[in-house]
Swiss-Prot record:
Organism: Ateles belzebuth (White-bellied spider monkey)
UniProt-listed InterPro entries: Glyco_trans_11
Family: Belongs to the glycosyltransferase 11 family.
EC number: 2.4.1.69, 2.4.1.344
Protein known as: Galactoside alpha-(1,2)-fucosyltransferase 1
Keyword Glycosyltransferase: yes
Residue ranges of the TM segments: 9-25
Length: 366
């Protein structure tokens, strides 16, 4: 055999290097796609916009309780189709939207909303979940699951690829780990936010004429609850004594607050809320068919006083700050407590003031 020349040895070495590089690239390429990553991950293009619902964390991934998920993945990691039946009023559908988004991400599924929910929420918020076409809805082999109003362990491991949720979930235990993402989904459209801020900028304290330093949104739920709570649930709504105590709580802790009152019973509020101190403004229009003006006003305040109901919950959740709520508003034997857990409904840092249940005891007397 003829000995190899120096030139031949160099060429052979270069060939081995080229083949090794090609083999290494192919290995990385195949391994990346085996784990669900596309070329956009290997060579990220900042012009590509990934839908928020694509964020999904594997079980056990640590998550900050007040930020969005820290571990976004490519949308290809999601599969199936999940939606939720839109039911109830404005606050109910906000709870359904947030719960669908959170559970779908937790289970690695794609979330879609139905047209009725889009109609209710899209005029108010910059929601991003896509809408499921009616013809797709009717042809999809759904499994249906009715949720109760608190997060349960089984909801973290739902294997159904085509799932239609229902119920009235409105508990922070479903979605609080995604708080910033939820707040982003429920960002007001500019014209609503600006209109609410214009209203607040015009407010002055009655006695001094000074500008308020603290805005406290007050939502007083009345309407159908006046009958539903005592007759069906052995419960009460917030009365004037509760509202006075809640306002005094803020007066003792915040300088120069103004209380911005909204309600679906504004006439009752004007007659029963003491405005003699000059720090109460009856700002709500009370229009139940178009609640977004009142809602926008509440979310632009610094703090919240709520009575009962999902409308007040969401106003407080989005406003941030301090929240005072009506606590223990049913009798201990109320059937309502089978579907409602106070510890799952109100954030731990919120402040509860016990309701006056004496009207219920009077009704119970023979």
């Amino acid at each position: 055999m003829w000995p190899l020349s120096h030139r031949h040895l160099c060429l052979a070495f270069l060939l081995v290097c080229v083949l090794s590089a090609i083999s290494f690239f192919l290995h990385i390429h195949q391994d990346s796609f085996r784990h669900g990553l596309g070329l956009s991950v290997l060579c990220p293009d900042r012009r590509l916009v990934t839908h928020p619902v694509a964020i999904f964390c594997l079980p056990g991934t640590p998550m900050s309780p007040n930020t969005s998920s820290p571990c976004p993945q490519h949308p290809a990691s999601l599969s199936g189709t999940w939606t939720i039946y839109p039911d109830g009023r404005f606050g109910n559908q906000m709870g359904q939207y947030a719960t669908l988004l959170a559970l779908a991400q937790l289970n690695g599924r794609r979330a879609f909303i139905l047209p009725a929910m889009h109609t209710a929420l899209a005029p108010v918020f910059r929601i991003t979940l896509p809408v499921l076409a009616p013809e797709v809805d009717s042809l999809t082999p759904w499994r249906e699951l009715r949720l109760h109003d608190w997060m349960s362990e089984e909801y973290a491991d739902l294997g159904d690829p085509f799932l239609k949720l229902s119920g009235f979930p409105c508990s922070w235990t479903f979605f609080h780990h995604l708080r910033e993402q939820i707040r982003s989904e429920f960002t007001l459209h500019d014209h609503l936010r600006e209109e609410a801020q214009r209203v607040l900028r015009r407010l002055h304290l009655g006695r001094s004429g000074d500008r308020p330093r603290t805005f406290v949104g007050v939502h007083v739920r009345r309407g159908d609850y006046l009958q539903v709570m005592p007759q069906r649930w052995k419960g009460v709504v917030g009365n004037s004594a509760y509202l006075r105590e809640a306002m005094d709580w803020f007066r003792a802790r915040h300088e120069a607050p103004v209380f911005v009152v909204t309600s679906n019973g504004m006439e009752w509020c004007r007659e029963n809320i003491d405005a003699s101190k000059g720090d109460v403004v009856f700002a709500g229009d009370g229009q139940e068919a178009s609640p977004w003006k009142d809602f926008a006003l509440l979310t632009q305040c610094n703090h919240t006083i709520m009575t009962i109901g999902t409308f007040g919950f969401w106003a407080a959740y989005l406003a941030g700050g301090d929240t005072v709520y009506l606590a223990n508003f049913t009798l201990p034997d109320s059937e309502f407590l089978k579907i409602f857990k106070p510890e799952a409904a109100f954030l731990p840092e919120w402040v509860g003031i016990n309701a006056d249940l004496s009207p219920l005891w009077t009704l119970a007397e023979p």
